[in-house]
Amino acid sequence: MRVLHVCSELFPLLKTGGLADVAGALPGAQIAAGMDVRVILPAFPDLKKGIANLQVVRELDTFAGHVTLLFGHFNGVGIYLIDVPELYERAGSPYHDPALYAYADNYLRFALLGWMGCEMACGLDHYWRPDIVHAHDWHAGLTCAYLAARNRPAKSIFTVHNLAYQGLFDARHMPDLHLPREFFQVYGLEFYGQISYLKAGLYYADHITTVSPTYAHEITLPAYGYGMEGLLKSREEEGRLSGILNGVDEMIWNPAHDPLLASHYSRDTLANKAENKRRLQTAMGLKVDDKVPVFAIVSRLTSQKGLDIALSAIPDLLEQGGQVVVLGAGDADLQEGFLAAAAEYHGQVGVQIGYHEAFSHRIIGGADVIMVPSRFEPCGLTQLYGLKYGTLPLVRRTGGLADTVSDCSLENLADGLASGFVFNDCSVGSLSRAIRRVFVLWSRPTLWRYVQRQAMAMDFGWQVAAQAYGALYQRLYTH
């Protein structure tokens, strides 16, 4: 079966969020499972630079300008790049300028991505034509609309990585997209008078997936649906909405051979983790003490991630004897709040503003607890890294967090299921009660080590997701 992924980022060449991790790992896992998989993306500078031996497949004139379709390989996966320098040859973020203003022509840049995804299904490359076109997030949402307009030459799947980003554009651009005029309506891609590339994917795809089963249900509810819940509820009732968990790339995230860790360890050599903790405490200016639990936050610093309540819970956490390390950037008030906490609680709180992939490995390899108190979380990768590294996740019961972390309740401990700490309400009180439970387990080192081993035994490898997507593709292809 031939599968084409349509997306805008690819780890490690270009990443602004978790979408890149999926695009960088899922196709390879699918190829290993026996599928014929390729990826198509805009030819952003970092992608053109990072993919060697690019060959010209086709040159063509389109509604968005002259296109050169390039093809090469990266990590064993075939990659198509849509080369239109006037649209994509811009340094920095693929979505906005250095002043953080979205590019005014984004409507055209990502319409072309969708159109090219559709054209691939219509035979643009004479030597390779997909049976399934798998589009990701709003950037690729129009792919499904173009396929519908062309009488569906391939089956389409649209994966929502985060429903909050909707790809909204002024209705006056509709004629520029070369789609049927009747597509601009409520039963189409119109959303409160605007064009929504996200809604185009949701409405016209043969099947919608999200990145966890719980999030797939949550987005059918007003609290999480961002105005799309009615459409999503109907897709759920039609059996056309499902959740498949993201995976962890075990070539990159594995404490047994992570080159970024000072000391390697596994389930059977957990004592070796202590050296990583000592180095982390030293690097973050904390008192070196293996008797106190280190709580880590590695995240965008936003209220969506629940970090306002995490900040408020710090005094109580420190009073019980813990330490806190923070790595991330985001909202100015949260950045200032965490920096103020580091200044006030010198030696107990360490904060680094910014994001460094290498340092995130050292934090997760050295900390005892990873905090992910999100208000909503489509899947979440940080807690999966924590599980893999025996750094117990402390999470709110939402989205992928609910699907991947089992609370250290007495029942779960007895049944061998416990892997972390889960709280329900997005409040300081609820988080603080969960923190107290962390300290109770911490006071029993043998039990703590038992839960660490449980967590590290869980399998969230990409091969699991690859098999789930393969079964979905097969079901769509044969119906």
UniProtKB/Swiss-Prot annotation:
Its EC number is 2.4.1.21. It comes from the Bacteria. InterPro entries: Glyco_trans_1, GS/SS, Starch_synth_cat_dom. It holds the Pfam family Glyco_transf_5. The keyword rRNA processing does not apply. Belongs to the glycosyltransferase 1 family. Bacterial/plant glycogen synthase subfamily. ADP-alpha-D-glucose binds at K15. One of its GO terms (biological process) is glycogen biosynthetic process. PANTHER family: ALPHA AMYLASE DOMAIN-CONTAINING PROTEIN, GRANULE-BOUND STARCH SYNTHASE 1, CHLOROPLASTIC/AMYLOPLASTIC. The lineage of its organism: Bacteria, Pseudomonadati, Pseudomonadota, Gammaproteobacteria, Enterobacterales. Keywords: Glycogen biosynthesis, Glycosyltransferase, Transferase. One of its GO terms (cellular component) is cytosol. Gene3D superfamilies: Glycogen Phosphorylase B. Synthesizes alpha-1,4-glucan chains using ADP-glucose. This is Glycogen synthase. The keyword Glycosyltransferase applies. Pathway: Glycan biosynthesis; glycogen biosynthesis. It catalyses: [(1->4)-alpha-D-glucosyl](n) + ADP-alpha-D-glucose = [(1->4)-alpha-D-glucosyl](n+1) + ADP + H(+). One of its GO terms (molecular function) is alpha-1,4-glucan glucosyltransferase (ADP-glucose donor) activity. It is an enzyme of class 2 (transferase).
